[in-house]
Swiss-Prot record:
Binding residues annotated for substrate, in chain numbering: 409-410
One Pfam family from the record: PCP_red
Protein family (similarity comment): Belongs to the ChlB/BchB/BchZ family.
Active-site residues annotated for this sequence: 274
Protein name stated in the entry: Light-independent protochlorophyllide reductase subunit B
Gene: bchB
Length: 534
């Protein structure tokens, strides 16, 4: 573990909470100090759930460490069963309680409760949230699911959706509609929405649909081996992936690969006249591996973007992420350090960022358009409306979500043609985004600099000379360390496409600083360009 301001994933017990909270009739008894109860807010405040998670905490304090914490845990188990009467109980420790090394599974078994008890041993200091969810779901399946006779009608299970998942609620509905349109019934959705009784009948399905490998792949692999159920490998995000998914499901179910795409609008919208401005837009993607790999395909093949960078924060999926990145001629960024992600974005200077809530903050600081494609997300990404990411309707949602942050094509032309216009100037931003407009008549630093006398450095032929030649008295006209752009240089800079303009500005200012210049003229800009082109 390491101390950080932001984190992409919580500790493993948060993943276990996501599984328990998504289920019905399940209760999670967590051996944890009072401070770890913060996790409740993730579900009630961020996800807007109408009830608190089915989790009981031992909430031991410092003074309890000298006494019997095991008895505290057993009391919490007894109280949880008597109060909530769950069909099954999960038991485990938080990252803090793991240091005490109480055997929560053995302690719970010693109580001889009349319901199944699922033991969770989650290595808090080696693994993180997605692993915790994946492992918890696996242990629940191992404890409760058994081979059984298949349903008469071809059916499948949907595996992987959890509480606090990115659009999981709507993805379930969209994929269920897609499957039912093919004549395939959904036997169970798990863990989200499933009860322990539903888990027990997972074996009745003919095959499994793995929606989210991060949180369901271990259970899918176990079911393939133990329940003899094959599982799908294609995640239906985007038009192409959805068609591939339909073909894969049809092969497993022995039905015709047909699906109702009458509601699909994304391909035509992407090919419409105004959408030609999408072609070649440089995009950077970061998030969980499943969503990033799927989104990269949509970005390049369906929207016409140029993928200039991609990566994931979950190291368990580093191998498939690196393999996918190679297909775009890229090296994947696999890190859980948001500062590394920010550095990569600054270096690449993309026109659009597709990422998590973290990248939304980064994009805001850098002034780059951004859309969220992956957890972790904030409250606004749990919308009241129907907004899936998967299936044909999900493809429509992707188009709208990704295009909204961008300046529209016609408006880009107006910005180019009327760059100094009161309405269509660079600082105004897209017209469909409120609260960003800056009057074109606002005084600028470069105009103020016009009145200042030039130093010997800028008046010299060629635009720059070594700093020693600048008389100290004249250099004092501008505060030390401050670099000012002159009007002609600023005007020329605006002719550079805005998606690389920031990088050009930074490089020029760096060049000027190295040369000891305090004002950037047109000649300085050209010299910097030639310097970095070498």
């Amino acid at each position: 573990m390491k101390l950080t301001l932001w984190t992409y994933e919580g500790p493993p017990h948060v993943g276990a909470m996501r599984v328990a909270t998504g289920m019905t009739g399940m209760h999670y008894v967590l051996h944890a100090p009072q401070g770890d109860t913060y996790a409740d807010l993730l579900f009630t405040m961020i996800e807007r759930r109408g009830k608190r998670p089915p989790v009981s905490y031992t909430t031991f304090q410092a003074r309890d460490l000298g006494s019997d914490t095991a008895e505290l845990f057993q009391s919490a188990c007894r109280d949880a069963y008597e109060r909530f009467q769950p069909q099954a109980i999960m038991v485990g420790s938080s990252c803090t309680a793991e240091l005490i090394q109480d055997d929560t599974g053995g302690l719970a078994d010693a109580l001889s409760l009349p319901v199944p008890v699922v033991h969770l041993e989650l290595p808090s200091y080696q693994r993180k949230e997605n692993f915790g969810a994946d492992e918890s779901f696996l242990q629940i399946c191992r404890k409760l699911a058994r081979p059984m006779e298949r349903t008469e009608k071809v059916s499948c299970n949907l595996l992987g959706p959890t509480a606090l998942g990115f659009r999981h609620r709507d993805d379930i509905l969209e994929v269920t509609r897609l499957l039912e349109g093919m004549g395939i019934a959904v036997n169970a959705v798990a863990p989200m929405g499933a009860s322990p009784a539903d888990i027990a009948r997972l074996g009745a399905a003919h095959f499994n649909v793995l929606l989210y490998p991060e949180t369901g792949e271990s259970a899918a692999r176990w079911a393939e081996k133990t329940l003899k159920q094959p599982y799908t490998k294609t995640v239906p995000i985007g038009v192409g992936a959805t068609r591939d998914f339909v073909a894969e499901v049809a092969a497993l179910a022995g039905v015709a690969p047909v699906a109702d795409d009458s509601r699909l609008r994304q391909p035509w919208w992407s090919a419409s006249v105004d959408s030609t401005y999408l072609t070649g837009k440089r995009v950077f993607l970061f998030g969980d591996a499943t969503h990033v790999i799927a989104a990269a395909r949509v970005a390049r093949d369906e929207m016409g973007f140029e993928v200039v960078g991609m990566g994931c924060y979950n190291r368990e999926f580093a191998r498939p992420m690196r393999a996918a990145a190679k297909g775009y001629g890229l090296e994947a960024l696999v890190t859980d350090d948001y500062l590394e992600v920010e550095e990569a974005i600054q270096a690449l200077a993309p026109e659009l960022i597709l990422g998590t809530q973290m990248e939304r903050h980064i994009a805001k600081r850098l002034g780059i358009p951004c859309a969220v494609i992956s957890a972790p997300v904030h409250v606004q990404d749990f919308p009241a409306r129907y907004s899936p990411q998967m299936g044909f309707e999900g493809a429509n949602v992707l188009f709208d979500t990704w295009i909204h942050p961008l300046t529209m094509g016609l408006e880009e032309h107006l910005l180019t043609m009327f760059r100094e216009d009161f309405e269509f100037h660079d600082e105004a931003g897209p017209s469909h985004h409120g609260g960003k407009a800056v009057p074109a008549s606002a005084p600028r630093a470069d105009e103020a600099a016009e009145a200042l006398p030039l130093t010997g450095a800028e008046t010299a032929e060629g635009g720059s000379i070594p700093p020693e030649a600048v008389p100290p008295a004249e250099a004092a006209a501008v505060p030390a360390g401050e670099i000012v752009w002159l009007t002609d240089a600023e005007r020329e800079l605006k002719k550079i496409p805005f998606f690389v303009r920031g990088k050009a500005r930074r490089n020029t200012e760096k060049f000027a600083a190295e040369k000891g210049l305090t004002r950037i003229s047109l000649e300085t800009l050209y010299e910097a360009k030639a310097h970095y082109a070498r």
